[in-house]
Amino acid sequence: MPKSKELVSSSSSASDSDSEVDKKAKRKKQAAPEKPVKKQKTGESSKGAASSKQSSNRDENMFQIGKMRYVSVRDFKGKVLIDIREYWMDQEGEMKPGRKGISLNPEQWNQLKEQISDIDDAVRKL
């Protein structure tokens, strides 16, 4: 629709006013992301207590298998998952799960455990 307005109005003042409106809209869009950040900072105290409970539960179910690599057992949407995943440190020093990894359901985990000896044999052959 804006294209039709540009075709109808041939005066330069109309296009100038459109560009001013665009600039103002861009400024508003840039300012908008800043507001949620400020709101999150004020509510961190209540969220911080909840996240500390989650992190203590997560720490109990995390088993280190390498540098920044862990096997963890967690509940996701009512389902138990076994994660084998790389982690990274954010700017606050909190560990966050990375993209590299896999989540197994208990059935897949049991199948993997049953095949451990075969996997070990294959590793020895190489």
Curated annotation (Swiss-Prot):
One of its GO terms (molecular function) is DNA binding. One of its GO terms (cellular component) is nucleus. Residues 31-44 have a biased composition (Basic and acidic residues). It comes from the Eukaryota. Keywords: Activator, DNA-binding, Nucleus, Transcription, Transcription regulation. Residues 2-50 are annotated as: Regulatory. Residues 7-16, 45-55 have a biased composition (Low complexity). General coactivator that functions cooperatively with TAFs and mediates functional interactions between upstream activators and the general transcriptional machinery. May be involved in stabilizing the multiprotein transcription complex. Binds single-stranded DNA. Also binds, in vitro, non-specifically to double-stranded DNA (ds DNA). Belongs to the transcriptional coactivator PC4 family. PANTHER family: RNA POLYMERASE II TRANSCRIPTIONAL COACTIVATOR. This is Activated RNA polymerase II transcriptional coactivator p15. It comes from Gallus gallus.
